[in-house]
């Protein structure tokens, strides 16, 4: 029996309708604010995490750039929680979809670029032509810098998609090998099972690291334009 390795990355449907919107909305639902006078441990941890993220991300920013702190904190929490929820068995990981990751990368990148051209026109245009460039190389460098600017959101999305997809595929392959080896060689199956556990722990770290890297790069793009 042949199994499609990429079947877990296909957008799930309910009665023929895609339910990815419900999946995307799930992390914000579990991160709702508390209406209690005294917060429980979960909401206390949530507030501490937001303050820590804001402090780390906004240290290099000007007052104008710090107005993006809530958006960046929401972005890293959303990506991190979505990646972690995708590690649960029989679940769908939205961040394995390039279209969704592009949807998260393009708006903040475009907002940062527009903000730069609006408030720092000369500095933004100076990025296209480094100082001291020989005159014959000016047209080529302008084209290269323009292409590199528009590649930034694609690089963000592809990096996140590739890392999350690769980890899930490895877990799928090693898990399948473990099931097959249980009926062939139990000692070998135990070794592959230990490898699977170690890989799962590594994927937990990768899920959080990729959320941090994605948001950090958005923060750096914002810093370059404010």
Curated annotation (Swiss-Prot):
Any GO BP annotation: proton transmembrane transport
Keyword line: ATP synthesis, CF(0), Hydrogen ion transport, Ion transport, Membrane, Mitochondrion, Mitochondrion inner membrane, Transmembrane, Transmembrane helix, Transport
Annotated GO MF terms: proton channel activity; proton-transporting ATP synthase activity, rotational mechanism
Transmembrane region(s): 10-30, 68-88, 97-117, 138-158, 164-184, 189-209
Membrane topology: Multi-pass membrane protein
Reactions mediated catalytically: H(+)(in) = H(+)(out)
Keyword Transmembrane helix annotated: yes
InterPro entries the record matches: ATP_synth_F0_asu (IPR000568), ATP_synth_F0_asu_AS (IPR023011), ATP_synth_F0_asu_bact/mt (IPR045083), F0_ATP_A_sf (IPR035908)
Localization per Swiss-Prot or TrEMBL: Mitochondrion inner membrane
GO cellular component, one term: mitochondrial inner membrane
Keyword Transmembrane helix on entry: yes
SUPFAM superfamilies: F1F0 ATP synthase subunit A
Described function: Subunit a, of the mitochondrial membrane ATP synthase complex (F(1)F(0) ATP synthase or Complex V) that produces ATP from ADP in the presence of a proton gradient across the membrane which is generated by electron transport complexes of the respiratory chain. ATP synthase complex consist of a soluble F(1) head domain - the catalytic core - and a membrane F(1) domain - the membrane proton channel. These two domains are linked by a central stalk rotating inside the F(1) region and a stationary peripheral stalk.
Similarity comment: family membership: Belongs to the ATPase A chain family.
PANTHER family on file: ATP SYNTHASE SUBUNIT A
Description of how the protein assembles with itself and partners: Component of the ATP synthase complex composed at least of ATP5F1A/subunit alpha, ATP5F1B/subunit beta, ATP5MC1/subunit c (homooctomer), MT-ATP6/subunit a, MT-ATP8/subunit 8, ATP5ME/subunit e, ATP5MF/subunit f, ATP5MG/subunit g, ATP5MK/subunit k, ATP5MJ/subunit j, ATP5F1C/subunit gamma, ATP5F1D/subunit delta, ATP5F1E/subunit epsilon, ATP5PF/subunit F6, ATP5PB/subunit b, ATP5PD/subunit d, ATP5PO/subunit OSCP.
Protein name (database record): ATP synthase F(0) complex subunit a
Lineage: Eukaryota, Metazoa, Chordata, Craniata, Vertebrata
Name of the gene this protein is made from: MT-ATP6
């Amino acid at each position: 029996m042949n199994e499609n390795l990429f079947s877990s990355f296909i957008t799930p449907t309910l009665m023929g309708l895609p339910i990815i919107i419900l999946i995307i909305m799930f992390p914000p639902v579990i991160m709702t604010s508390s209406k209690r006078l005294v917060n429980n441990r979960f909401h206390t941890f949530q507030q501490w995490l937001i303050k820590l993220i804001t402090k780390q991300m906004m240290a290099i920013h000007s007052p104008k750039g710090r107005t993006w702190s809530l958006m960046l904190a929401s972005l890293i929490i959303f990506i991190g929680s979505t990646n972690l929820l995708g590690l649960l068995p029989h679940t769908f990981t939205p961040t394995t979809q390039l279209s969704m990751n592009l949807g998260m990368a393009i708006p903040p990148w475009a907002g940062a670029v527009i903000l730069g051209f609006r408030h720092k026109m000369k500095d933004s245009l100076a990025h296209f032509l480094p100082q001291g460039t020989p005159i014959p190389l000016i047209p080529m460098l302008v084209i290269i810098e323009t292409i590199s600017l528009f590649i930034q959101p694609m690089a963000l999305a592809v990096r996140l998609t590739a890392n999350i997809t690769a980890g899930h595929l490895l877990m799928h392959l090693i898990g399948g090998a473990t099931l097959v080896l249980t009926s062939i060689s139990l000692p070998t199956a135990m070794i592959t099972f230990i490898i699977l556990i170690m890989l799962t722990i590594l994927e937990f770290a990768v899920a959080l690291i990729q959320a941090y890297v994605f948001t950090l790069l958005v923060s750096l793009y914002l810093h370059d334009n404010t």
